[in-house]
């Protein structure tokens, strides 16, 4: 990250992120805006946009969970410790579509369906502006934690090709459990593994072309081939059925590192194009389009040979089921801006679509016995969004303020759609009531899960900004939105900045915001079938509109609401720039995924209402209130020397704390089914503590960039504070101690066209603390999914860039 003044990011008509004043730089706004340049992204040494931002921004975290179904492939990121879908993502100041995946497993971001930033190739990016402040009154739903605005390259000439190759060179030590009495295999107590895996090749290219004279067409391509990593544990459990009361001899020779717990296998192709063309008379045409094809593979838990979920005739040694999602992502935008009297006008249409379809491999449907297929089409889901936007900006010389009053007005119409496609029948059906139904690890979506719904949202806004005096900047915005499914919302924002001197200012804002319930949260459905006494019972993730969900207490979802306060200081101390921003975010009615309500009392209650064969399930619900407070600090210090080159030092820090102040209660009808004191929670201990302590409360980073002639280097240290992996009881909680990761890269310019780089991410090969054996029952997962930096170890890489 670099100072906004040095980034020199050219702001398009309508202003930069957080302001609609066309010539307002990010350093002069009343709200905190960071700028991450394309050079910073490239020098980060990583191949994912989310991961690059996590090392550049103080309050941005990108955990990398494993064994989490589709979340292994589309991983959520968080800003200021809030949910992934509470940060709005824009491309060239236009709303980006979300992914179709809603995270339903036990990871950070459970219940959220967020934008997948990794659908945008780094080669297409000129800079990324990050507004660390709520902005619902300016941009609409989702902008509670902040706004990420990706600025695309606008080049009519030149180009670049970058090829990088890297791999994991690592070693980790983990405890093991105890083998059963009389076992013919050993449990060493502790084991160290030396690994070399995760080979990743990335090719990124962009080319600028002239378009009809004075226009530009910038094309970008990225291809990524990533091999999996395996950071599994030692599975000390019995694997085979007993033979005449004795352990099978194969127990002594089977590979007990039998999981793929780590980074997924990924093959990904991304194309991006951005264009602009002057039309004359102050008008111009612009637009962009993108396409991504991502094929990934990750694994579930190992099914042992003796498991009831296995069929010995198919897998005599057990099997590792593979989840192989196919993700397709498309977007296109076209717009025109023109001058209408004193108004700078803009109109655009933006379309986005994301689809995720599941193939389940190396698995079986145990209820079909030896005739079961081993590969299944399990169905999937998709999400689409079309946004029409028209806006106008002008300046009025009121004679009252120290500057003209900037007035911005606009209207936005957004159409969203969401659908679920059923899998093939063998992926979900049951052929034997004594066996589990469906494809192991991920049963297919059933016909009863199929949905195809849509909604329309209409919003209007007005935004004012002016220098009230020579030293006082003020802005105000108000936005009204109406949704066809849940109702309307009104958001407002006030922001002030007072420059005491040319080198010191205070800034602050107050606002209310909202996030509309996403379509996946309203309509996602999935079914697994369990047999109780030979009778099939469905355990479902219900859409809130399902009558069975209503019987369990579900109600139509409403918007999440927030009140944000921020107060900050901006100082220029000679060459050193300093920003300190404190924030407080009070959220009401956060949308969460409930606990699974599958107790026998629930099943009996549902049967009494006529819902036969349903043993309960879970659903999305409003009702969690939280308070989040924190401080962001950013220090930039450029140093020019005569003989030692240039040094750019950046220090960033974030302290963040969230408290859950209210959880939704179980319905009165269900509460009455349980004895006093034994009522199950609707939102339980694990989920509450995930909100409060699942993210580190503090994160600090020091970054040094050095350049001298043809040579350059980056040295970065990032300190992640403690995080908690919560258990169902305090005795099963596990605290991840703070860790410091060091990254190092060296660069050399062979000539004006060719640059080579060598580097290491996580140079010292740090890992999160390993679970004790008592908390790792299967032995497969020695590390927590709550680790803020993953658990892949050291990554060594080389990179060659050719400019033309």
For the regions a protein language model found, what residue spans apply to each?
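Short acidic/polar hinge/loop motifs at secondary-structure boundaries
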Residues: 94-132, 178-182, 195
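Extracytoplasmic beta-strand/coil segments of soluble accessory domains associated
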Residues: 22-23, 54-100, 142, 146
